[in-house]
């Protein structure tokens, strides 16, 4: 065994085959960390009720025009892309716990700036700050949870990251019914504040502590999280933290998971989910549902329910099966949604949203049928996304990278995800103008089909494996 080999010197924390940890505090620690994803879910969902509220106001009150509204929805993803870079840097230097604590600062500050906004630039600045926090939380929370969880529950706890994201989105939708945009921003300060309080009492991950040569602290963390360190294999004495070097990209244990991680994030965003969630109210308004806010809340409830189902079956069904099933469902649902717009393309429209067609011009029986096609395909897409392509890319990102490159590698993946989210969100309307709405949704269906092929041919199964066994798989050991 060579002490210079980072693969051989990283800590091995895994229980023996005959014993499974039963500590319950790991669930409390995971909940505390998952309040970060809850916060960034709220930040994502905030734009949906806030934009209509800000566009309804009359001068001299603060009001958003069309271009400013587009940036208000999209700028959070730019901040999140920068947050992905910052989070990758913090992850290996400040540690997992401190990184989560630090990300509460831009969350609270950003929502406070929005609350006090007197002009559009303050609104955009506040959104940029919350986006920065979103990027850090979306990277650090999955890593923290995957490193404190034992294999038997890692899929369940890791899926709770996405569950908290969609819960945050739903919370923003529901609160948007009764709260004006300023008070809605005040509510956005609550989850990160609660995370700050809870995380102060949670331990650093044992794996990170071992890279810092803090053996006693690592064992204390194990006892706190799992109830006892008894039965666990003693990690190698020479375990130490190794920095990222470009030469490491020649190793299959590095470049293979990096390609997979980046591809997962690209396919997740090309499914069109963020465009749909950012413009949920507008899309349902164009479909002529009487209460578009109610339709958006319905979508949020479906997303929460099916993400919860995915979390419960993740460690039984496995990652690959759920990804493939999710992709197939999204192909059919987006194809159907595109068909809805194709059937209505020749009708006159008074819409201001890229020529989307009101179904009210049709006879009543046709109108009802088309309305059900629209809402049915949208809900089917959300359900399909929630059981696979919603939670699993984040879960796999936290599982497939070796400890010594996790900060840089996950940072690259998160940067990719949020940059793609910005492009899709900002340019979705332009694509709909260029290809027509039906063409835009059929294009997303094609990307979903490619994601199924990618899953079946490239993505490995990590169910039931320790993080070290996953690394060994990529190394061919």
Swiss-Prot record:
Keyword Transmembrane helix assigned: yes
GO cellular component terms, semicolon-separated: cytoplasmic vesicle membrane; plasma membrane; synaptic vesicle
Glycosylation sites: 350
Catalyzed reaction equations: D-glucose(out) = D-glucose(in); D-fructose(out) = D-fructose(in); L-dehydroascorbate(out) = L-dehydroascorbate(in); alpha,alpha-trehalose(in) = alpha,alpha-trehalose(out)
Regulation (activators, inhibitors): Inhibited by cytochalasin B.
Pfam family, one: Sugar_tr
Recorded family membership: Belongs to the major facilitator superfamily. Sugar transporter (TC 2.A.1.1) family. Glucose transporter subfamily.
Subunit text: Interacts with AP2B1. Also able to mediate the transport of dehydroascorbate.
Protein name as catalogued: Solute carrier family 2, facilitated glucose transporter member 8
Source species of the chain: Mus musculus (Mouse)
């Amino acid at each position: 065994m060579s002490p210079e080999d980072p693969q051989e010197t990283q800590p091995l924390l895994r229980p023996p085959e005959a014993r499974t940890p039963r500590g319950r505090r790991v669930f409390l620690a995971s909940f505390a960390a998952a309040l970060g994803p809850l916060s960034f879910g709220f930040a994502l969902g905030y734009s949906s009720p806030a934009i209509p509220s800000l566009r309804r106001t009359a001068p001299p009150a603060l009001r958003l025009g069309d271009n400013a509204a587009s940036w208000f929805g999209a700028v959070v993803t730019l901040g999140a892309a920068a947050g992905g870079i910052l989070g990758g840097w913090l992850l290996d230097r400040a540690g997992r716990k401190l990184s989560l604590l630090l990300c509460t600062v831009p969350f609270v500050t950003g929502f406070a700036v929005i609350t006090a906004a007197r002009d559009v630039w303050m609104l955009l600045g506040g959104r940029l700050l919350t986006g920065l926090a979103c990027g850090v939380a979306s990277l650090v929370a999955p890593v923290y949870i995957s490193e404190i969880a034992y294999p038997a529950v890692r899929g369940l706890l890791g899926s709770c990251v996405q569950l908290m994201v969609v819960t945050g989105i739903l919370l923003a939708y529901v609160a948007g019914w009764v709260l004006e945009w300023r008070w809605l921003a005040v509510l956005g300060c609550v989850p990160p504040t609660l995370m700050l309080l809870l995380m102060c009492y949670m331990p650093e991950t044992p794996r990170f502590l071992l890279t810092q040569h803090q053996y006693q602290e690592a064992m204390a963390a194990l006892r706190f999280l799992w109830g006892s360190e008894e039965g666990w294999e003693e990690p190698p004495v020479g375990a130490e933290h190794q920095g990222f070097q470009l030469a490491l990209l020649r190793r299959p244990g590095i470049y293979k998971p990096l390609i997979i991680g980046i591809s997962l994030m690209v396919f997740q965003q090309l499914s069109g989910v963020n465009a749909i969630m950012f413009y949920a109210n507008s899309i349902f308004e164009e479909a002529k549902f009487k209460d578009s806010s109610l339709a958006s809340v319905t979508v949020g409830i479906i997303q929460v329910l099916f993400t919860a189902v995915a979390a419960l079956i993740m460690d039984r069904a496995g990652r690959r099966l759920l990804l493939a099933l999710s992709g197939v469902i999204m192909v059919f649902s987006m194809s159907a949604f595109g068909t809805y717009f194709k059937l209505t393309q020749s009708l006159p429209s008074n819409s201001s949203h890229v020529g989307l067609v009101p179904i009210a011009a049709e006879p009543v029986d046709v109108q009802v049928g088309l309305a059900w096609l629209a809402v049915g395909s949208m809900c089917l897409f959300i359900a399909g996304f929630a059981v696979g392509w919603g939670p699993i890319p984040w879960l796999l990102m936290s599982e497939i990278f070796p400890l010594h490159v996790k900060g840089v590698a996950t940072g690259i993946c998160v940067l990719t995800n949020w940059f793609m989210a910005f492009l899709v969100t900002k340019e979705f309307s332009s694509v709909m103008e260029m290809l027509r709405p039906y063409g835009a949704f059929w294009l997303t269906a094609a990307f979903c089909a490619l994601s199924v092929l990618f899953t079946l041919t490239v993505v490995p199964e990590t169910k039931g494996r320790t993080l070290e066994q996953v690394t060994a798989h990529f190394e061919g050991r």
